[in-house]
Design a protein with these regions (language model features):
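Basic, Lys/Arg-enriched alpha-helical interface segments
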Residues: 3-75
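Enriched for short, Lys/Arg-rich terminal
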Residues: 75-118
Length: 118
């Protein structure tokens, strides 16, 4: 079964996203967004070239993206579903099918300013 590895930058992104979600929308909203992120990461690990994922070679070689909106239904839980997720997972398929999660960025950001230059 494929696995994923989260970069330090992506880990910091997740912490920031969940902190902001908690502060602005409360604990249940944070829990919903956390479940959504986990569902998206697992979906990417299971099927890296899944429907909804995009080749992003224009940003960096081998880079792919997947918007959290595509994992909304899989992340549905007791407290509901995230209605309008706004983040994109940027990742690469590495050796041995290990998925490298590079960043999680807001979809309104100029992503090229926040991605590693490789």
């Amino acid at each position: 079964m494929p696995q994923y590895r989260i970069s330090n930058a992506a880990r910091a992104d997740i912490v920031d996203i969940l902190r902001l979600s908690q502060t602005q929308f409360g604990d249940q909203a944070r829990q919903r967004y956390q479940a959504l992120i986990l569902a998206a990461l697992q979906a990417i690990a299971d099927t890296p070239y899944r429907v909804g994922s995009h080749d992003r070679d224009e940003l960096a070689p081998g880079l792919r993206s997947y918007h959290l909106v595509y994992s909304r239904q899989q992340a549905k839980q007791l407290h509901g579903v995230v209605k309008s997720p706004r983040h994109i997972v940027f990742y690469r398929v590495g050796d041995g099918d290990v998925i490298e999660i590079v960043r999680l960025l807001h979809d309104a950001m100029e992503v090229q300013l926040h991605l590693p230059n490789d």
